[in-house]
């Protein structure tokens, strides 16, 4: 048996087409163009690539998107002042500070300086708190876990009662992913580097989400027959003298036992960017007092 390879790119492209129509109608009906500002501190090549991809996608959809380029030497206080200016600008609906930031800057302080209504990454303490207290409809949810859940729902709509295992406990993916799965009435187990007998937990999973950052960490023998496997990892390795990207799952082997699996690249990555656009539209509508507009186009 080989699993159904779930193309995040194909699903994200479909979402993009839907969002383009939504934004066009938003402009026509409410004279509103959602605006996303990405703050990039320093000149890290990987961060520059991520930012270009986000801006390209925003422009494709008809969003207004700008990148604020700041030197790596900027002081923490100056960066905070820049964010306050964006918070106070009513034409700006979404603010994203590209991570990582230089070591002399407190990442958590910066995240929590962003107005939570404009925090399209969903990392602000207020958004996290609302998500973890069952107020998903009243907050901005982190993009990658949202994208993962959407992919899972393209495979099966009824998740209630499923055993779900999340490998990883980061604030960006692991914890919010577990919370979203709990919201779907899954029985959720979070495992991590200190978990004893980690493979045994994985073998119980109807849904297995790998977000640990270790190349090909999840082996064939760890996976239940027919499981849905979502691979969040993106790891650069060199193999036979060739650099390539691989996930946290041993794709070639696990694909033989899973009922559905996401590839790397082309799986979760495109979904993350798609849901950044979703969050920007939600933020723009919320700030403009427009209720339920996106839900007419996209079932979240």
Curated annotation (Swiss-Prot):
Disulfide bonds: none
Binding of NADP(+), residues: 168-170, 193, 234
A cellular component term, taken from the record's GO annotations: cytosol
Pathway(s): One-carbon metabolism; tetrahydrofolate interconversion
PROSITE patterns, per database record: THF_DHG_CYH_1, THF_DHG_CYH_2
EC numbers, comma separated: 1.5.1.5, 3.5.4.9
InterPro entries, per the entry: Aminoacid_DH-like_N_sf, NAD(P)-bd_dom_sf, THF_DH/CycHdrlase, THF_DH/CycHdrlase_cat_dom, THF_DH/CycHdrlase_CS, THF_DH/CycHdrlase_NAD-bd_dom
Catalytic activity annotation: (6R)-5,10-methylene-5,6,7,8-tetrahydrofolate + NADP(+) = (6R)-5,10-methenyltetrahydrofolate + NADPH; (6R)-5,10-methenyltetrahydrofolate + H2O = (6R)-10-formyltetrahydrofolate + H(+)
Signal peptide (UniProt feature, chain positions): none
Pfam families: THF_DHG_CYH (PF00763), THF_DHG_CYH_C (PF02882)
Record text on subunit structure and interactions: Homodimer.
Cited function: Catalyzes the oxidation of 5,10-methylenetetrahydrofolate to 5,10-methenyltetrahydrofolate and then the hydrolysis of 5,10-methenyltetrahydrofolate to 10-formyltetrahydrofolate.
Protein name: Bifunctional protein FolD
Organism per entry: Ehrlichia ruminantium (strain Welgevonden)
């Amino acid at each position: 048996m080989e699993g159904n390879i779930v193309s995040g790119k194909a699903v994200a492209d479909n979402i993009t087409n839907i969002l383009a129509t939504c934004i066009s109608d938003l402009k026509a009906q409410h004279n509103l163009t959602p605006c996303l500002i990405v703050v990039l501190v320093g000149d890290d090549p990987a961060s520059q690539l991520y930012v270009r991809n986000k801006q390209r996608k925003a422009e494709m959809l008809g969003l207004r998107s700008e990148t604020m380029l700041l030197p790596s030497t900027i002081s923490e206080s100056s960066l905070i002042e820049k964010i306050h200016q964006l918070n106070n600008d009513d034409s700006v609906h979404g603010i994203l500070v590209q991570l990582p930031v230089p070591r002399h800057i407190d990442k958590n302080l910066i995240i929590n300086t962003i107005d939570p209504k404009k925090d399209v990454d969903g990392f602000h303490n207020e958004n996290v708190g609302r998500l973890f207290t069952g107020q998903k409809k009243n907050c901005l949810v982190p993009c990658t876990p949202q994208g993962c859940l959407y992919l899972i729902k393209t495979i099966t709509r009824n998740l209630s009662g499923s055993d779900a295992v999340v490998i990883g406990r980061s604030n960006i993916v692991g914890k919010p992913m577990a919370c979203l799965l709990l919201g779907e009435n899954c029985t959720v187990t979070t495992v991590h580097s200190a978990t004893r007998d980690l493979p045994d937990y994985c073998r119980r999973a109807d849904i297995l989400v790998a977000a640990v950052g270790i190349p090909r960490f999840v082996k064939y023998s760890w996976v239940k027959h027919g499981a849905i496997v979502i691979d969040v990892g993106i790891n650069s390795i060199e193999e036979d003298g060739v650099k390539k990207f691989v996930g946290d799952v041993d794709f070639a082997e696990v694909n033989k036992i899973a009922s559905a699996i996401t590839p790397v690249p082309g799986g979760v990555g495109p979904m993350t960017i798609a849901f950044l656009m979703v969050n920007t539209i939600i933020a723009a509508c919320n700030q403009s007092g427009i209720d339920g507009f996106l839900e007419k186009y996209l079932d979240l």
